Design a protein with these regions (language model features):
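FIC/Doc superfamily catalytic core
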Residues: 1-216
Length: 216
């Protein structure tokens, strides 16, 4: 067995991926393995985000820390898949190098050339924004609007949201699975109709979200 920081990946999986026989869409065992890799990657990224939150709680600028650290979150998120040979390490360097589309959405994210211009400006605005609630709502929204990566944008966007939550004294906030449709609907309104209010209300209504749960 091979090991990636405590995560065990079988030689059989490595060979299956190498030979092109790994098919999680058709094979339940392969699908379970993919879920395991995703879970391990999420855990690794979560540890990295917690380290970023410590910097924020120590007085660091949340926008600057997000700019400095989000690439590391992304690498951790897909690290187990790199170890398994499912993803190439080079694919995790920088932002996406192609067009990406969002299933069941009318919103088409900006092209890859625009991403290179948008992301530095995005983080600059996060660094300058004085209101934590604005950083939470618009930070999450604009990140997923741009969709800078080929995959994992929602997870990284929620990590970013929680870093901004910490900067305002709010607790860690999750999006329950049963609220997923509400989340997507609110983001669609913001992305297509330019109406951010449903998304702001959605976040405020989440477990841990909203001023009513702010730590003092």
């Amino acid at each position: 067995m091979l090991s990636s920081e405590g995560y065990r990946v079988s030689a059989e999986l490595i060979e299956k991926v190498r030979s092109g026989k790994w098919n999680p869409d058709a094979d339940k065992n392969d699908r379970d393995q993919r879920d395991g890799l995703a879970a391990r990657g999420y855990w690794q990224a979560f540890q990295s985000v917690k380290a970023s939150i410590k910097k924020v709680l120590a007085g660091g600028n949340a926008g600057q820390i997000a700019d400095d650290d989000h690439a590391a979150w992304y690498r951790e998120l897909f690290g187990p898949s790199v170890t398994a040979g499912i993803v190439q390490a080079a694919d995790l360097a920088g932002y996406r190098n192609g067009q990406v589309y969002i299933r069941r959405s009318m919103h088409t994210p900006p092209n890859m050339e625009a991403v290179r211009d948008l992301m530095p400006t995005f983080f600059e605005l996060l660094q300058q924004e004085q209101q934590p609630a604005v950083r939470v709502v618009l930070g999450h929204f604009f990140f997923v609007y741009v969709h800078p990566y080929m995959d994992g944008n929602g997870r990284i966007g929620r990590f970013l949201m929680n870093l901004m939550m910490a900067s305002g004294g709010y607790p860690w906030t999750i999006v329950p699975l049963e609220r997923r449709k509400d989340d997507m609907s609110a983001l669609e309104s913001a992305s297509v109709a330019w109406d951010i209010k449903p998304f702001a209300r959605f976040l405020a209504d989440l477990p841990g979200g909203g001023a009513k749960t702010k730590r003092t």
